[in-house]
Design a protein with these regions (language model features):
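C-terminal motif of bacterial Sec signal peptides marking the signal peptidase cleavage site
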Residues: 17-20
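Extracytosolic ligand-binding ectodomains
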Residues: 2-4, 12, 22-431, 438, ...
Length: 451
């Protein structure tokens, strides 16, 4: 009887278990996923860049554009936020062919594209007429290479430059000629706003210092044969030939001076202070001089790092103005950040208040938009290289800074030399010690063998 009851009990239990297995559990409430934070809006900031990308100055135009592209790449990598939005910078590059008419055409194109700012143009001759179009549209413009003083003398509140102008450069070059013992000078310019402007400023400075101008000749920015004007200059027996123009003409001119047996030294401004000048002039450039606004890149705190990044990125050496164009972009972005706006009407005023620790200088502008206290550096061509001579002009602070940086560089070089010598001395000491140990071991071995 008990066995029967047990069987029944087991059957009931099994049935209950099966019944339980067939029941579904009520699902437990699951917390709703947290809402993802709303993505911040992105605003595209269009910066125009204009330079000759074709023709004899294309190498300089590409150099300028690369300086701007490197700056924009770094700004985008930082992920800047302005006015509550993430900013993405884009470069709109245009080719003005170093032609004033074409410069105005592409300037209007950028105005129509509603760019937030313009970096350029490269040449003074294209920058000056284009600047009126940008001014009328209220678009800020910063040039990293246009040095003719007229650019910032037009009264436009939108025009700025990040390097010394030709008044400053011409004065320094005139003073330098006197320091070199020059008594007579022949002047040649290419009739462009830059070339003629620089030559005129040099002439004023030279005459004020008592130099005699024995010839004043002209060419153009497309010429390659200068023998006619150089033959005239040869007859004057000038101590110095000053050229206001670019490297595409300066290099061949120096070469033809040598071919004609002209013994005078050649002196020019930033337009001929380039690797291209040496390439075109060859051995004829040896011993000649040129100037560049600013302090040598290798003597600037951030200079060597910038050069390494530039070469790695573009696979090319810096030609001339790339560091200044890089600074021009950075100054524009800095003004936008301070204004907390990318609207030209709102950030323009902040450009005038700039005090930016740039690559090429401590960038600040005077009431005209010119760089305050811009220095000028003199170079000499030696053995196919540009060799730094000295930094002149500019504010005492700028020159003093250059001298301090030069002294620091010399100390570093001396320290490397001392470290190298110490390393060599250490190597010799270690070698001598090793030889002594080896000799002692051999002597001990010989003594043991004798025993």
């Amino acid at each position: 009887m008990q066995a029967k009851i047990s069987v029944v009990a087991l059957s009931v239990a099994a049935a209950f278990a099966l019944s339980a297995c067939g029941q579904k559990e009520e699902p437990k409430p699951v917390a709703a996923p947290a809402a993802a934070p709303a993505a911040k809006p992105e605003v595209v900031v269009k910066l125009g860049h204009v330079a000759p990308m074709t023709g004899p100055q294309a190498h300089l135009g590409k150099d300028n554009e690369n300086g701007a592209r490197l700056a924009i790449e770094e700004l985008n990598a930082k992920g800047l936020e302005i006015g509550g939005a993430k900013v993405k910078f884009e470069l709109l590059g245009e080719d003005d062919q170093a032609d004033p008419k074409q410069g105005s055409i592409v300037a209007q194109k950028l105005v129509d594209a509603k760019v937030n700012g313009v970096v350029g143009h490269l040449n003074s001759g294209t920058t000056i007429p284009a600047s009126k179009l940008y001014s009328d549209a209220g678009i800020p413009q910063i040039s990293g290479s246009a040095t003719n003083p007229k650019y910032t003398q037009q009264g436009f509140k939108t025009a700025f430059r990040v390097m010394a102008n030709d008044v400053q450069q011409g004065k320094v070059l005139g003073d330098f000629a006197v320091q070199q013992g020059v008594k007579t000078v022949a002047i040649v310019d290419d009739r462009t706003a830059y070339g003629q402007g620089l030559a005129d400023e040099f002439k004023k400075s030279a005459q004020a210092a008592g130099l005699k101008v024995v010839a004043n000749e002209y060419t153009n920015d497309k010429a390659t044969d200068f023998k006619a004007i150089l033959t005239k200059i040869k007859s004057t027996k000038a101590d110095l030939v000053f050229y206001g123009g670019m490297d595409a003409q300066g290099g061949p001119m120096a070469k033809q001076m040598k071919e004609l047996g002209i013994k005078a030294k050649f002196l020019g401004g930033d337009g001929v202070c380039t690797p291209e000048f040496m390439k075109l002039g060859g051995e004829a450039t040896e011993g000649h001089y040129c100037s560049l606004p600013g302090v040598p890149l290798e003597k600037l705190a951030k200079g060597p790092e910038f050069k390494d990044k530039f070469v790695k990125k573009f696979g090319a050496e810096i030609q001339l103005y790339a560091p200044y164009v890089y600074d021009a972009v950075m100054v524009m972005a800095d003004a936008m950040k301070r204004a907390d706006s990318v609207d030209p009407a709102k950030y323009l005023a902040e450009i005038g208040k700039t005090n930016y620790d740039g690559l090429t200088a401590q960038v600040a502008f005077d009431e005209f938009g010119d760089l305050k206290g811009g220095a000028i550096s003199i170079y000499q061509y030696k053995s196919g290289k540009l060799e730094y001579v000295s930094t002149l002009g500019g504010s005492p602070v700028a020159v003093a800074k250059a001298e301090v940086q030069e002294a620091v560089a010399e100390v570093k070089d001396a320290a490397k030399a001392v470290a190298g010598a110490a390393t060599e001395a250490g190597k010799e000491a270690v070698k001598a010690g090793a030889d002594a140990v080896k000799n002692a071991a051999e002597a001990t071995k010989a003594a043991v063998e004798k025993k």
